[in-house]
Amino acid sequence: MSAFQNGGIASRALDDDSDIEEEALANDYKEQVQYEGMEELEQVNSMSMAQQTDDIQSRLAAAAQPLDFSAPLEVKFASYDNYCSLFHFILNSDGPVDLEPPSYYWAWDVIDEFIYQFNSFCSYRNRVARQGTNEEEIQILREAPNTWGCYSVLNVLYSLIQRSQINEQLAAMKRNEEPMAVAGDYGSKSLYRMLGYFSIIGLLRVHCLLGDFSLALKTLDDIELNKKAMFARVMAAHFTTYYYVGFSYMMMRRYADAIRMFSHILIYVSRTKNFQKNAQYDSISKKNDQMYALIAICVAFHPTRLDDTIHTALREKYGDQLLKLQRGGPESLPIFEELFRSACPKFISPTPPDFDNPELNVDPLEHHLSIFMDEVKTNMWSPTVKSYLRLYTTMDVKKLAGFLEVEPEKLRGWLLVNKQRSRQIRWTDNGLLDGEVVNSNDLDYAMQGDLIHISEAKVGRKLVDWYLRNLARTY
């Protein structure tokens, strides 16, 4: 197997970017992940111990190196083969590989680059299929449907998690027990433990890219999102985790939880920008606009108080746009679409495209955008209706319909949908999917025949907390 191709590329920016099933994935990993060069891998046993160690160390270091986005197709294929070879060696050797990771962040770099190349290849393949103009590349891609396949990538991640027993270790730590007692021969090794841990973050990312947002959050059941978590030691992993958790919450209409996630990471970045002056931080800071765009969307759906730092930055970046989002109506639609396009991840399709019928291939981004915009249109008139309802304690449906110039029955249906939308699940404890149903609006109403009963519960601002918070910042 040839060495991993990296083309001498410098660090790239961050991309714009079941237990039974896990056991089955681990068992059939060897026969499902196919690649050329197996004979060469088997010859490693005949090498001297020094040569073998040097070769593996070089492959470990190479696996974390970024691949040029514009690399030719054969280089992308070779990169996939090299990853398969490396992961096969790590997972299927006779016993655990006795090697230490080159650095504490190496495992994250490997998983991050592995998923980045998978994401880039899928987007590239889908684009070639939709255009249908390059016959040579189409033929090459048609003959290799399993290269950078969704199943293979998920198989690697699940296998690393299962082999390292990382979920069992994290669960033991939650119970204040010794994780090494359940780690086993593989999980006790730093190489497997770190790869398994960051594979969980990788699964969050991949499931989100595939559009399965609930499964994305489910993968983090054993990871506690706090400053003591292992991912918080690596800035890029920290940022990525909160971005994808927040985005998954947003797509599940849990806007309060999404705002909490986005706020955490944006405040963290703003407070550490003077202490982290490196290429990694620079690449992350360039994605801040995406984070602010997403939080602007969430605040439009779920008006709430924000941290003063975020609120100020949001007004500076999206002043006029933010006002239009909050007013709703047809003029807000293009702004929602623009912000979503600029801030969403690069979605991918779980299956190879149809090269014979290019017109049948749907852009995954357009698919998720249409779902999102349907939700926007459902809530489009919410600010306008609320502005009328706030003026009354009781109101006739026909009267409100006259103000809005719509049919009473159409308005009745909208009011029922809007009331259902105002009930959100908000996280309280345990897993990220858990929580309790709360009323997300300060305005509530009930319908009795044609009569609307309105109640408003507005919590006054706690001035003491505000003064204490700002005094702490000043001094």
Swiss-Prot record:
Residues of the PCI domain: 257-451
Record bears the keyword Transit peptide: no
Subunit structure: Component of the eukaryotic translation initiation factor 3 (eIF-3) complex.
Subcellular localization: Cytoplasm
Alphabetized InterPro entries for the sequence: eIF3l (IPR019382), PCI_dom (IPR000717)
BP GO terms, sorted: formation of cytoplasmic translation initiation complex
UniProt entry keywords in alphabetical sequence: Cytoplasm, Initiation factor, Protein biosynthesis
GO molecular function, a single term: translation initiation factor activity
Role: Component of the eukaryotic translation initiation factor 3 (eIF-3) complex, which is involved in protein synthesis of a specialized repertoire of mRNAs and, together with other initiation factors, stimulates binding of mRNA and methionyl-tRNAi to the 40S ribosome. The eIF-3 complex specifically targets and initiates translation of a subset of mRNAs involved in cell proliferation.
Protein name: Eukaryotic translation initiation factor 3 subunit L
Origin superkingdom: Eukaryota
Gene Ontology cellular component list: eukaryotic 43S preinitiation complex; eukaryotic 48S preinitiation complex; eukaryotic translation initiation factor 3 complex
Family per record: Belongs to the eIF-3 subunit L family.
